[in-house]
């Protein structure tokens, strides 16, 4: 890795259902887990952000299936203040209220290390599958970035929207998935093609080009509300 003590995960997604635990991002050694947790939430799912030495459990309920959302998870274990080692941004705003907190040790190396297997939209044994849409997924190795590196508020609507991140320095083990390809293999023409320049392409499991949609965070379609 460029620097295993500083990393950033950025995820753009829209949910379709919230009736079960669903995984957004997972590593095989539990260095990072981002999950919608249905357990214990009678009226909707909460979001949980884990590493293998820390966790942030949010109190908010996420029940909107009509809007795109953006999560940024910034990890910086070089910080002397424990609360600054994890930062979470949701739709451009830093989340500071959590039900449970636990922070990693200073100088801990957890994300982006060599040999780390990553699953997006599921976890290692292919359960807790995410039900919804994903438009962009990025991992930045060596920098702890805030949400403004990935999005901005629209001057007319005030809605948080993505910006062009192709100019970011992604680091040695960083990747940028735009899901624009059509193949299922881990190569430059596949759905999981890495366009960061690192060629860290992802293979696709249980998904084909026929499952792709033009509903994106810059072209949002109307959907039925399951709460009504």
Name each region found by the language model.
Residues 96-118:
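Predominantly extracellular beta-rich ligand-binding scaffolds that present long acidic/polar faces
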Residues 66-77, 88:
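Short tryptophan-centered beta-strand motifs in secreted/extracellular beta-sheet-rich domains
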Residues 1-6, 55-63, 123-126, 161-168:
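Short surface loop/edge beta-strand patches of beta-sandwich-type extracellular domains
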């Amino acid at each position: 890795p460029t620097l295993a003590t500083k990393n950033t995960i950025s995820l753009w997604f829209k949910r379709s259902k919230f009736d079960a635990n669903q995984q957004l991002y997972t590593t095989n050694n539990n260095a990072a887990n981002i999950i919608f947790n249905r357990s214990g939430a009678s009226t909707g799912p909460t979001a949980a952000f884990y590493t293998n030495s820390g966790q942030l459990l949010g109190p908010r309920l996420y029940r909107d299936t009509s809007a795109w959302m953006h999560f940024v998870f910034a990890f910086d274990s070089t910080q002397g203040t424990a609360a600054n080692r994890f930062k979470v941004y949701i739709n451009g705003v830093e989340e500071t209220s959590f039900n449970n907190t636990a922070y990693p040790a200073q100088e801990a190396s957890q994300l982006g290390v060599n040999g780390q297997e990553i699953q997006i939209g599921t976890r290692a044994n292919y359960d807790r599958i995410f039900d919804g849409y994903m438009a962009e997924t990025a991992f930045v190795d060596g920098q702890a970035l805030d949400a403004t590196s990935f999005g901005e508020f629209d001057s007319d609507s005030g809605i948080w929207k993505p910006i062009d991140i192709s100019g970011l320095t992604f680091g040695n083990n960083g990747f940028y998935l735009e899901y624009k390809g059509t193949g299922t293999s881990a190569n430059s023409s596949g759905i999981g093609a890495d366009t960061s320049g690192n060629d860290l392409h992802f293979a696709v499991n249980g998904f084909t080009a026929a499952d792709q949609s033009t509903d994106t965070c810059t072209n949002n379609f109307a959907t039925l509300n399951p709460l009504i």
